[in-house]
Amino acid sequence: MESLTLQPINKIQGEVNLPGSKSVSNRALLLSALAKGTTRLTNLLDSDDIRHMLNALTKLGVKYTLSADKTECVVEGLGRPFSVSEPVELFLGNAGTAMRPLAAALCVGQGEYVLTGEPRMKERPIGHLVTALQKAGADIEYLENTNYPPLKIVGTGLKAGTVSIDGSISSQFLTAFLMSAPLAEGEVRIKIEGDLVSKPYIDITLHIMKQFGVEVINNDYQEFVIPAGQHYVAPGDFLVEGDASSASYFLAAAAIKGGEVKVTGIGKNSIQGDIQFADALEKMGAEIEWGDDYVISRVGKLKGIDMDYNHIPDAAMTIATTALFAEGTTAIRNVYNWRVKETDRLSAMATELRKVGAEVEEGEDYIIVKPVPHLKHAAIDTYDDHRMAMCFSLLALSDTPVTINDPKCTSKTFPDYFDKLKALSC
C-alpha cells in the first residue's frame, strides 16, 4: 500500500482557493441534466464522485462538454425525466451524492436501470429512501441485501400525494426525494419521521432547486410541499461554491500553527452549513474573520469544547483531530450518521486517535477526545475515506511526523489536497 509521511510543520501561512463543493456539484449536475435549456457550471469539483455522476449522465443520454481542467461543464438539459430504450447499469463508486439522488430521479423516468457501486456502497443504507419511493408508486427491488444497494429500478413515475420519509439516518434520502418530486404527477407532500439530521444539507438542496426554478414550501423541516406544475429550468450560468468541508482542514491548521490562512471561494453568505465549522473553531479559541467570499483563520490558544455537531457532521471530523492541540477535553456529540458514511467514522476515528496516544471514549453517537502532551508517530489507516486522510494530516502540526496510508483516497473530493497543504507549510 502506498503511504505518505508528513514531517513536522513549523508554521502555516498563505491563501487557498477551494475546489468546488461536492454536495453542490452533484446536485447541480443532476438538475442541469433534467432542466430545460443549457447550464454552464463553473468551479465544478474534479474528483471521483463527480466523475461517477458525469459517467452516469453520459449513459443516460445527457450531452455535456467539459473544459480541459474539468472545472467548467456545459450541460444540455433534457427538459424531461430520463428515458432509455435498453437496460442501463450505472456504477457509482462510493458516491452517496450520486447514488441516492439518481435512485429517486430514475423512478420518474422510463426504462430499466441497475445502480451499483464499490463494496462499501453496498454497506451504506438506502432503505428509508426506497420505502418512501415505493409508497409513491416506484418499482424498485434490492438485488443483494434488503435496504442496501445494488438496486434495480423500472421507471414508472411517482404519484402525487403525501409520503413519509425517515430523516434520522441521512439527509441524502430527503434530498433525493425532494429533487425528484417536481417530476411527479402532481403536488407532493413529504412528512419527516424521526429527527432530521444534517439540516444545512437540506438547505443546500432547496437553494439549488430554487436556482433551477422550483419552489418548495418548508414547514419547519417537519413537512415539505412541492406544488404541482413546476419544471426545472436552466439558470444559464451556475457558480459552484468552494467546498466548505474542505476548508475546515486549512482553517484548523492556521488555528493550530498559524500565521493565518485565507480560504477563498466561500464566505459569510455561503449556502453550505459546514461553513459553521469556523464558528466552532472560534469557540475553541481561534481568531476568525469573515468576508463575502473568504474566511481567514488565525492562530489562537485552543481549548476543548463540548458541542452537538449534528448540523455539520463532515466538518466535525476535523474537530476530532484539532482536539489533540487543545487544552482539555473535547466532546463531539450527536454524530451517529458518521457510522453510515464512507466508513464507520466513529470507530475509525477512535482507533486512529488511540494509535497516536490520545485518550478516547467512543459512544454510539459521540466521541470524546483527551489530548496528550506528546503524540506518537503512527501509520494512520484511512479506510478508503478521504476525510480520514485529510483530518489526520493535521497531526504534522505537532513535533512528530505522521504517516498517512493510501493518501490518494482524497481523490474522492480533493485530489491535490496534500499539494495545497505543502504550499502553506513554512
Swiss-Prot record:
One of its GO terms (cellular component) is cytoplasm. NCBIfam families: aroA. This is 3-phosphoshikimate 1-carboxyvinyltransferase. GO terms for molecular function: 3-phosphoshikimate 1-carboxyvinyltransferase activity. Pathway: Metabolic intermediate biosynthesis; chorismate biosynthesis; chorismate from D-erythrose 4-phosphate and phosphoenolpyruvate: step 6/7. It catalyses: 3-phosphoshikimate + phosphoenolpyruvate = 5-O-(1-carboxyvinyl)-3-phosphoshikimate + phosphate. The gene is aroA. Monomer. The keyword Mitochondrion does not apply. The keyword Magnesium does not apply. One of its GO terms (biological process) is amino acid biosynthetic process.
